[in-house]
Amino acid sequence: HRICELSPQGHIVMIDPHGEYASAFKTTGALYDVSNLQMPYWLMNFEEHCEVFLTTQGSDRQVDADILAKCILLAKGKNRLAQEFGKLTVDAPIPYLLSDLTQILQLEMGKMDKATDTAPYLRLRSKIDEIKADPRYQFMFSGMLVGDTMADFIGRIFRMPSNGKPISIIDVSGVPSEITSVVVAVLSRMVFDFAIWSRGEAKRPVLLVCEEAHRYVPKDESSGGQAVRKILERIAKEGRKYGVSLGLITQRPSDLAEGVLSQCG
């Protein structure tokens, strides 16, 4: 509340894992949950796509990842926005249709000579179809979201204009646990990118607050999602250069990654 009073033009994004903060910030906060978050799946970078769509480990995972990268590039290439990029990369935030992706997987699978070579394509298509059919994933994988732009999403989440509500509370309690870390990774990356892009504008500090931070940057590097760990570590190290502050809330500080903990004041 004090930060809101001191910096009404600032932006605060709070990741709320249990839906506990909405009542505390009724007058100053805008609440987003699975009913209205509407976070387009195509905002994911490739690493985040892999965490959602890949189901294998070891050498099979690399095979699946290579196929997924090729097919996502082809799907994004169908969007007229792709022509504006000199060289299209798999990380480019360009909308694409999931139906195009599954169709391309099917076409590429048809080029295989042996039945055993089709296994990676079948795995990927099966996982994508499973996600599309699961209503819990609709907030992110709805076909309606392909018409959104990154500017639309950032404008909504960062409350521009803030209209007296500088806090965005992102309630992720309804997000399937398998993709919670990816959702937090995308939101955190949007926070960092927003700060970098708006450097030339009037100073608008951004505070990203993560409740239960040990989930996202655990001391054990093998647990938790790697994408969310990377972006939060980067914000902790570099965020202050761009006006981004990171607030980590945890009852288990000993379980936090030491690199992030050392950056905390």
Locate each region found by the language model.
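Post-Walker A helix-loop "phosphate-sensing" segment adjacent to the P-loop in P-loop NTPases
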Residues: R2-V13, F194
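Short, hydrophobic beta-strand segments that form beta-sheet elements in well-ordered domains
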Residues: H11-D16, L31, L248-I249
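P-loop NTPase motor domains
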Residues: G19-R234
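Short regulatory helix/loop adjacent to the ATP-binding pocket of P-loop NTPases
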Residues: A22-T28, P253-G265
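Glycine- and other small-residue-rich loops at beta-strand/loop junctions that grip anionic moieties
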Residues: V172, I249-P253
